């Protein structure tokens, strides 16, 4: 079964797409968030590429978890607390078994840290994951 981009997003990436300060999240051209006036916004971006940052055949759950973890650890190193994140996912094909386990790993950490996914992009190509938090 081949999923369209919007079917893929709806099925695997909208379960945890709202949070405090999120006016508009997953599914539109961009996200709208409210930052309290007494805070600063720290932003980081990391990309995970198959056969560079993880081996082909690595458990997709672990790939999802690690992809968010590397960003949140960068924020922690600066004394910042994660607020939300975006996900850009490049896939050779929309394999539902991979997407199911990947999204479970990703959202296990997102729920633990109470940070919503607020947007991103999906496209076809060599497997890579880019997250900004």
What are these language model-derived features?
Residues 48, 82-133:
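Glycine-rich anion-binding loops of enzyme active sites
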Residues 10-13, 72, 103:
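A generic alpha-helix structural signal
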Residues 42-48, 52, 68, 72, ...:
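Long, contiguous hydrophobic alpha-helical segments, chiefly transmembrane helices and signal peptides
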Residues 22-24, 55-70, 94-104:
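Glycine-rich anion/phosphate-binding loops
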Residues 1-59, 78, 87, 109, ...:
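Extreme N-terminal cap/leader segments of soluble proteins
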Residues 67-78, 107:
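A short, N-terminal amphipathic alpha-helix
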Residues 33-35, 72, 127-128:
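Ubiquitous "structural anchor" signal
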